[in-house]
């Protein structure tokens, strides 16, 4: 006969953590889709440099509005979680701090690694009569850098997910 007085360990509340992990994964996927789907379509369907530059500039414009905002939101959520856990002496707060730092790493990567290429593409988009080969080469270079940048939020999500698994007692390292 089963006892009705069995004691269960309390289920950890991980709603904020799950939201941060999901946002980071969504951000990474949205960013990666530009490199894996959108830019190849644009490259394969344009035979005029000026049109290609116009499309890239619009893609950059809308991406610049959405992606940094998602990165800041995700990082802020990770920072809040890390701070809250550290304030009460929770030993696994650093997993969320690392997840946030990894996610926001897209900003310095953009400013140090990608900005020269971004600036060149923007400068070319304001002129006419550009070489298709040069523009395609710059956009392919941009795609590779953007692909690398897209991985940062995914690594952040993995680190955050490990933190969630630790809290739930599923992962012990």
From Swiss-Prot:
Enumerate the subcellular locations listed in this protein's record, separating them with semicolons.
Membrane
EC assignment: 1.10.3.-
| Keywords, comma-separated and alphabetical | Glycoprotein, Membrane, Monooxygenase, Oxidoreductase, Transmembrane, Transmembrane helix
In the UniProt record, does the keyword Zinc-finger occur? no
**Catalysed reaction equations from the record:** emodin anthrone + O2 = emodin + H2O + H(+)
Single GO molecular-function term?
monooxygenase activity
What protein is this chain from?
Anthrone oxygenase MYCFIDRAFT_34418
Q: In which pathway does it act?
A: Secondary metabolite biosynthesis
Biological role:
Anthrone oxygenase; part of the gene cluster that mediates the biosynthesis of an emodin derivative that may be involved in black Sigatoka disease of banana. The pathway begins with the synthesis of atrochrysone thioester by the polyketide synthase PKS8-1. The atrochrysone carboxyl ACP thioesterase MYCFIDRAFT_190111 then breaks the thioester bond and releases the atrochrysone carboxylic acid from PKS8-1.
Q: What induces it?
A: Expression is positively regulated by the cluster-specific transcription factor MYCFIDRAFT_198930 and is up-regulated during banana leaves infection.
Which EC class heads this enzyme's classification?
oxidoreductase
The record ties this protein, via Pfam families, to: Anthrone_oxy
Q: Which family does it belong to?
A: Belongs to the anthrone oxygenase family.
State the source organism's domain of life. Answer: Eukaryota
Keyword Nucleus among UniProt keywords? no
Q: How does it sit in the membrane?
A: Multi-pass membrane protein
- Glycosylation sites (chain numbering): 118
Main subcellular location: membrane
Residue spans crossing the bilayer: 23-43, 62-82, 93-113, 138-158
| GO cellular component terms, semicolon-separated | membrane
């Amino acid at each position: 006969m089963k006892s009705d007085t069995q004691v269960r360990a309390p289920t950890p509340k991980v709603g904020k953590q799950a939201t941060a992990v999901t946002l980071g994964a969504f951000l990474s996927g949205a960013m990666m889709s530009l490199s894996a789907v959108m830019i190849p379509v644009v490259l394969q369907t344009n035979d005029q440099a000026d049109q290609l530059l116009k499309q890239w500039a619009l893609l950059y414009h809308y991406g610049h509005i959405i992606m940094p905002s998602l990165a800041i939101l995700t990082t802020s959520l990770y920072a809040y979680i890390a701070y809250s856990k550290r304030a009460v002496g929770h030993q696994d707060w650093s997993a969320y701090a690392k997840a946030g730092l990894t996610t926001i790493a897209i900003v310095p990567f953009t400013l140090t690694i990608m900005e020269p290429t971004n600036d060149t593409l923007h400068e070319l988009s304001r002129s006419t009569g550009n070489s298709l080969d040069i523009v395609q080469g710059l956009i392919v270079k941009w795609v590779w850098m953007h692909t690398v940048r897209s991985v940062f939020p995914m690594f952040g999500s993995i680190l955050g997910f490990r933190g969630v698994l630790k809290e739930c007692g599923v992962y012990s390292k």
